[in-house]
UniProtKB/Swiss-Prot annotation:
This is Large ribosomal subunit protein uL10. PANTHER family: 39S RIBOSOMAL PROTEIN L10, MITOCHONDRIAL. One of its GO terms (cellular component) is large ribosomal subunit. Belongs to the universal ribosomal protein uL10 family. It comes from the Bacteria. Part of the ribosomal stalk of the 50S ribosomal subunit. The N-terminus interacts with L11 and the large rRNA to form the base of the stalk. The C-terminus forms an elongated spine to which L12 dimers bind in a sequential fashion forming a multimeric L10(L12)X complex. The keyword Membrane does not apply. Forms part of the ribosomal stalk, playing a central role in the interaction of the ribosome with GTP-bound translation factors. GO terms for molecular function: large ribosomal subunit rRNA binding; structural constituent of ribosome. The keyword Glycoprotein does not apply.
Amino acid sequence: MQKQHQRQHKVELVANLKSQFDSAKALLICDYKGLSVRKLEALRNKARIQGIKVQVIKNTLAHIAMKEAGCADLDLKETNVFLWGDDQIALSKLVFDFQKEHKDHFVLKAGLFDKESVSVAHVEAVSKLPSKEELMGMLLSVWTAPARYFVTGLDNLRKAKEEN
């Protein structure tokens, strides 16, 4: 009875992970050997704010869920923490910022963007891109620049006329 209950729990866990991996735009796998529980919880809290999921999953269960979700096949070994979400840039930034703080205990091992395997170097390059909010700010600045210059020009013209 106990084994059957455990098996059912694993089947449900794999089904849940499959649906989440299926809808995720990005999935990163990191080694967290030696990282304290408190630091892992801090990572989870930062991730939760950004809508990113963080979970330690047995490699065999994660492998099954990823395969069922149609993700690229990855060789999962040792201790892994899985992070996934819809924003590739935010997820990449979160992982690399956390990795900078905890170099010896937290290392990115593999990544999937849109279910395709990507290199650690690719994820690092993505982490350096501006976020969606930063891009919108840049775009807004570009859009408002002509009006700003026009108003500045009119103000300078007014000042020149007042001096004469």
